[in-house]
Amino acid sequence: MADLKVTQIKSIIGTKQNQKDSLRTLGLKGIRQTVVREDNAQNRGLINVVRHLVTVEEV
């Protein structure tokens, strides 16, 4: 499977708690931080919750 490069592009101020938790689970702590995660159903679900706060690229 491919990897996904996830970059946070917007702030978590004013977001719901489940969205904040999803970003933390992905390992994102601030704007413009990038992490590489395995492309699997669990990570896709987390990304789907915060799709308006992040950009995703296949690596």
Swiss-Prot record:
Any one biological process term the GO annotation gives:
translation
As given in the record, the signal peptide range reads: none
Establish whether keyword Ribonucleoprotein is in the entry.
Answer: yes
Provide GO CC annotations from the record: cytosolic large ribosomal subunit
What's a single GO MF annotation on this record? structural constituent of ribosome
Matching InterPro entries, A to Z? Ribo_uL30_ferredoxin-like_sf, Ribosomal_uL30_bac-type, Ribosomal_uL30_CS, Ribosomal_uL30_ferredoxin-like
For this UniProt record, the keywords arranged alphabetically read as follows: Ribonucleoprotein, Ribosomal protein
PROSITE patterns linked: RIBOSOMAL_L30
Q: Look up the domain of life of the source.
A: Bacteria
The Swiss-Prot or TrEMBL record describes its family as follows:
Belongs to the universal ribosomal protein uL30 family.
Describe the subunit structure.
Answer: Part of the 50S ribosomal subunit.
Which HAMAP family does its entry note? Answer: Ribosomal_uL30_B (MF_01371_B)
Q: By what name is this protein known?
A: Large ribosomal subunit protein uL30
Origin species: Rhodococcus erythropolis (strain PR4 / NBRC 100887)
List the top taxonomic levels of the source. Answer: Bacteria, Bacillati, Actinomycetota, Actinomycetes, Mycobacteriales
